[in-house]
Design a protein with these regions (language model features):
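Short glycine/acidic-enriched loop and turn motifs that connect beta-strands
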Residues: 41-42, 84-86, 129-131, 167-170, ...
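Short loop/turn segments that connect beta-strands within beta-propeller blades
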Residues: 45-49, 90-94, 134-138, 174-177, ...
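Bacterial Sec-dependent N-terminal signal peptides
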Residues: 1-13, 121, 159-161, 172
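Short coil-to-beta transitions that initiate beta-strands within beta-rich domains
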Residues: 7-29, 55-73, 98-118, 141-157, ...
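Structural signature of WD-repeat beta-propellers
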Residues: 36-38, 81-82, 90, 125-127, ...
Length: 256
């Protein structure tokens, strides 16, 4: 959510107050921890113990983050948004937007189901196949239309594997023309991949306090006596949206 300068600071300025209460994923990149929480992003510098939040006001291109992943070879954090837009964040805080996939008009299902790193590349498993992102060059290198949804992918030996819950496991030799669907052959049954955060990174992330409200969902707000009162919620058990708890939040100064 965004509130105006009357609450947040100087006249004519804006400040985002995003929720970071629900930790979803933690990545380590150099001396920093990058934390995806409540679909928002912040980092923790282990050298000086500083916390930095990221949003559209201070550099990001979009909001509602779906996946993050650190690419060690390119020394960049890959940020994939729910609308399929992509940002690359380096360890100095510089952001490079890669909007090509987001802007590309396709008749297939573009939904990104997961991301996997190999060298300087990030492989996006999508609703139609795999998209290969060159993280170092900040460009889309290739797109492999397999005509089935891919849940996750990985490289092992001289092969790239595409795991699909609906179609099973497929693979192709890295030396083959991966654009040619006939080079992808069945390699077994689909196996659910369990992704768990490193316990030590999660434990440290739980000690951090980047601030912000409990929830990003605001149903009603009112400004009274230099305080911003708000109610969250919109919880729907049928939609299983537990990230929208019923809550009353009060902002005074910069503190919730």
């Amino acid at each position: 959510s965004v509130v105006t300068s009357g609450v947040a600071g100087g006249i004519g300025t804006w400040k985002n107050y995003l929720s970071y209460s629900n930790i979803q994923w933690v990545e380590q990149g150099g001396n920093k921890l990058y934390v995806l929480a409540s679909n928002s992003l912040y980092s923790y510098n282990r050298n000086d113990q500083s916390i930095r939040t990221y949003d559209k006001i201070n550099g990001l291109s979009d909001m509602d983050i779906k996946f993050i992943g650190w690419n060690q070879a390119a020394r960049r954090l890959v940020i994939v948004y729910s609308d399929n837009n992509i940002d690359l964040l380096d360890d100095k805080g510089n952001v490079r937007n890669v909007p090509d996939y987001y802007l590309k008009a396709l008749t297939v299902n573009k939904t990104v189901n997961g991301i996997d790193m190999s060298g300087a590349f990030c492989y996006l498993s999508t609703g139609f196949g795999i998209v290969k992102l060159n993280v170092a060059k900040a460009e889309i290198s290739d797109s492999y239309n397999l005509a089935f949804p891919v849940n996750y992918c990985y490289i092992e030996g001289n092969y790239i594997y595409a795991a699909s819950e609906s179609n099973g496991l497929y693979r192709a030799a890295l030396s083959a023309n991966l654009l040619d669907r006939s080079n992808w052959t069945s390699a077994g049954s689909y196996v659910v991949r369990s992704r768990t955060m490193a316990a030590d990174l999660l434990a440290q992330a739980k000690t951090l306090n980047p601030g912000g409200p409990k929830s990003n969902t605001f149903i009603w707000t009112d400004f009274h006596n230099n305080r911003l009162y708000s109610t969250g919620g919109n919880f729907n058990p049928d939609a299983n949206n537990w990230e929208n708890p019923g809550v009353v939040q009060v902002l005074q100064g910069d503190d919730w």
